[in-house]
Amino acid sequence: MSTFRLALIQLQVSSIKSDNITRACSLVREAAKQGANIVSLPECFNSPYGTNYFPEYAEKIPGESTKKLSEVAKENSIYLIGGSIPEEDDGKLYNTCAVFGPDGNLLVKHRKIHLFDIDVPGKITFQESKTLSPGDSFSTFDTPYCRVGLGICYDMRFAELAQIYARRGCQLLVYPGAFNMTTGPAHWELLQRARAVDNQVYVATASPARDEKASYVAWGHSTVVDPWGQVLTKAGTEETILYSDIDLKKLSEIRQQIPILKQKRADLYSVESKKP
């Protein structure tokens, strides 16, 4: 199949985990009714974003949140990218995205590789590494439509990850992410367009809706960018479902017109992956 419908759920996240899960599943069902084949939730869809919240909201996989995601994926026969949740495993915490297939089975689990440790004086200081551990693996999954590569938020800043995914046959990269009011206006769309053009892939980002009262205010603006670098659709700041019909014929045409993937100079440079 050369076309499919992608849905990004820009969820308004509250401090009540059960409400977040229930609302997320409701919006997933709505997206499926509108013909979505692949649906993505945002980063930290079941909890507020913050190092003080991660230990409190963390759960094992499978657990409360992922069991519900499995059920709703199977109920609606869709591929569901479960945004991310704080995951507890063997005494460590991770920022983890679980993906479920139309049969409800877990396809892959991506743990955020690059932790969000930044300091922009006078604007924002954040250190995920205070409570989280980094993942150490690449994460892709196959659908009847295309191969999908996964990253979470800060992972998008690292071009090497996207390059490796493209080399491994991914045609769509999905980054559940929660950029903030400093980095969002500066880099959110820029990075998506860069990753799309550099690798001639579709790039999609699913953000939480903006909550001005939250301790961490998300930028919002979930987005889909095509391999030409064109923004196909972009949300505002409120809770919504963003739809985009992905055309893989267009991707093939762009790769034929500007064949950069075949023109790379492996005799001069390379991006090396140290793990499978």
UniProtKB/Swiss-Prot annotation:
GO terms for biological process: asparagine metabolic process; glutamine metabolic process; oxaloacetate metabolic process. Residues 4-248 form the CN hydrolase domain. The modification N6-succinyllysine is found at residues 68, 123, 130. It comes from the Eukaryota. SUPFAM superfamilies: Carbon-nitrogen hydrolase. The active site is at residues 43, 112, 153. Homodimer. This is Omega-amidase NIT2. It comes from Rattus norvegicus. The gene is Nit2.
